[in-house]
């Protein structure tokens, strides 16, 4: 179909909504807790109390972060917290988001090892998504993260028992395997029964989460998409072979999360409504590139006398 001189074509390209970092995970890294390359885990958040890192977290949408409820044992006042996103190191960066609201599943921080150790953090304003800041996908409530499944845990916590992370304070990653419920229950057996509850998931390395990793994500790749299986919750020691790390099982809380965040990214199409949208607008002499409605670049096309310009 021919176009008149004042007509144009508008093309839309939907960008995958969650779980697809622009820097791929090579799968060849040494197991056990090593520095993560920039952009590999773009949903990783640092939760800070009075500018001091206290917990990890994961970005679910431009306005919401998932973390652990016990992270707020120091304060339940949202104005005391800041959230850093898109950063590889824990530094005193001036770029952070303030917190508008904290929603804990149990209504208040519980003691270590308690059930319901999950919380949502609403940011004061949505963050801009980029190659360094992307949301992770939520699994379906029926998803099965089976025993032996290979997953990754990330954070800025201790690198061993009594060993704080050393400069340059780079984000650490460790490959872990999901542990079956029976084995984990036996590992944490007590006179009153097992400490492992139905809303908990266990995984072990030799890599493991440790102090200050709480609230961070345990993610597993399913059909090429990274889904969050767990939230770092508790454990006995760090990296002990007979004591798996214990996580809040995300599948147990997916419906609760979607109740508060309808736009949170699922493993399928439900992640797309808030995803970045590319729009290419063509006129006979002008090309405009928009991302989420923001003009990123404009190019004059037809006349060689027009120099290409970028905003």
UniProtKB/Swiss-Prot annotation:
Glycans are attached at residues 77, 192. It is found in: Membrane. One of its GO terms (molecular function) is serine-type peptidase activity. The keyword Cell membrane does not apply. GO terms for biological process: proteolysis. InterPro entries: Peptidase_S1_PA, Peptidase_S1_PA_chymotrypsin, Peptidase_S1A, Trypsin_dom, TRYPSIN_HIS. It is a single-pass membrane protein. Its EC number is 3.4.21.-. Its main location: membrane. Residues 1-16 form the signal peptide. Pfam families: Trypsin. Disulfide bonds join 18-137, 55-71, 151-220, 184-202, 210-238. The keyword Membrane applies. SUPFAM superfamilies: Trypsin-like serine proteases. One of its GO terms (cellular component) is membrane. Keywords: Disulfide bond, Glycoprotein, Hydrolase, Membrane, Protease, Serine protease, Signal, Transmembrane, Transmembrane helix, Zymogen. The active site is at 70 (charge relay system), 117 (charge relay system), 214 (charge relay system). The chain crosses the membrane at residues 277-297. It is an enzyme of class 3 (hydrolase). Expressed in many tissues. Belongs to the peptidase S1 family. Tryptase subfamily. This is Tryptase gamma. The lineage of its organism: Eukaryota, Metazoa, Chordata, Craniata, Vertebrata. The gene is Tpsg1.
